[in-house]
Design a protein with these regions (language model features):
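NTP-dependent small-molecule kinase module
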Residues: 2, 22, 26, 75, ...
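Structural motif
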Residues: 7, 77-79, 101
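Glycine-rich phosphate-binding P-loop
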Residues: 8-21
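Short amphipathic alpha-helical segments
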Residues: 20-21, 89-92, 112-115
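Post-Walker A helix-loop "phosphate-sensing" segment adjacent to the P-loop in P-loop NTPases
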Residues: 25-34
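Conserved beta-strand scaffold positions in the cores of enzyme catalytic domains, especially
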Residues: 31, 96-101, 151-153
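ATP-dependent small-molecule kinase phosphotransfer cores
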Residues: 36-93, 126
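A glycine- and Lys/Arg-enriched "phosphate-lid" helix/loop adjacent to the NTP-binding pocket
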Residues: 96-144
Length: 159
């Protein structure tokens, strides 16, 4: 296990940054916001990166930063977006450390309200269509993410 990395993620709308800040404060560790670090290095917003490079290109950048952080000498807490576990290589790095999933106690309605307030989302479905269409796309995403995170929790319990 890589004791240098505590990764916090969660479904779209989960309070990932808040949970990561809490853990960093409790453990006296620095906090790295993965999206902010990518934006700082690349110079473009996450939304622009995804538009220009596609999600695959963005996931490659996530992997590069996670790889550097995991091999660093200093432990840290990393706040990650809701899709970081979609990439097999990033997932492998995350599994070498500690994974915390934020917002498991929130209902879909609570996640939806939080997601609507996220002006920086790269999820295209939040920018187009009616409120009902956005909610339907959100519900579909949340069902898939919840299933993935449940699998991650079960896998963590087996360690």
């Amino acid at each position: 296990m890589n004791a240098n990395l505590i990764v916090v993620t969660g479904c779209f709308g989960a309070p990932v940054k808040e949970k990561a800040q809490e853990i960093a404060r409790q453990k006296g560790l620095p906090l790295v916001d993965l999206d902010s670090e990518i934006t700082k290095r690349d110079g473009r917003s996450i939304r622009r990166l995804v538009m220009m490079n596609g999600e695959h290109g963005y996931r490659n950048l996530e992997y590069e930063v996670l790889s550097e952080l995991s091999s660093g000498a200093s432990p840290c807490v990393v706040a990650c977006g809701d899709g970081v576990l979609y990439d097999d290589d990033s997932r492998e790095i995350i599994h070498s450390g500690e994974l915390v999933i934020a917002g498991t106690d929130l209902s879909e309605d609570e996640l939806w309200e939080n997601a609507k307030a996220d002006a920086d989302t790269y999820h295209a479905f939040m920018s187009f269509g009616t409120e009902e269409e956005k909610r339907a796309a959100f519900s579909d995403l949340i069902r898939r993410q919840c299933s993935m995170f449940e699998d991650e929790i079960l896998q963590g319990e087996k360690k």
